[in-house]
Amino acid sequence: AIYETVKERYDLLGKQVIIFAGQGNNGGDGFVAARLFAEEVPVVVLFFGDVEKLSEEAELNYNKIKDTVPILDIRTKEDLANVHFQKRLKFIFIDALLGTGIKGDAKEPICYGIDLFNSEGAIKVAVDLPSGMDPDTGESGEKVCDFDMIVCFHDLKKGLEKFKDKTVVVGIGIPDSDV
């Protein structure tokens, strides 16, 4: 759903996609997007977390891309020294760091990812909700990812009502009766 929505809205020609992924299900959605984008454009995954702590869904999708898509593991601030964005390239950043299950402010290493995400000029797309934002209230934590568009799964999160003009809601096959 992320890949299709971004492709409908933005021209991928000449772009490089950078997936900022965490270790939960939101990160798993980022890994799925990485696999699909990699069929068309260069993709790099910046993984902020511990492979040993991946959710079941995230681990499944991580394993599908680990041999075909470059993944940089970032656990410390020092690991960021290996990340450089060439200014001549045009980027699409995908925020798949945190999902709806996170409450409170982002912790290390996720906060490093949010800082890096916000520091560069790129088209910025959030998966389900911007990392660092409360899904119920729409309030931002100490750090929150910037966004040009939010690709929201199944329905508009309660806290994102004020951002509905920048939000695309996509179905992912969950019947209303199961929500």
Residue ranges of predicted features:
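YjeF_N-associated NAD(P)HX repair module
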Residues: 90-179
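Nucleotide and nucleotide-moiety/phosphate-recognizing core
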Residues: 3-97, 105-127
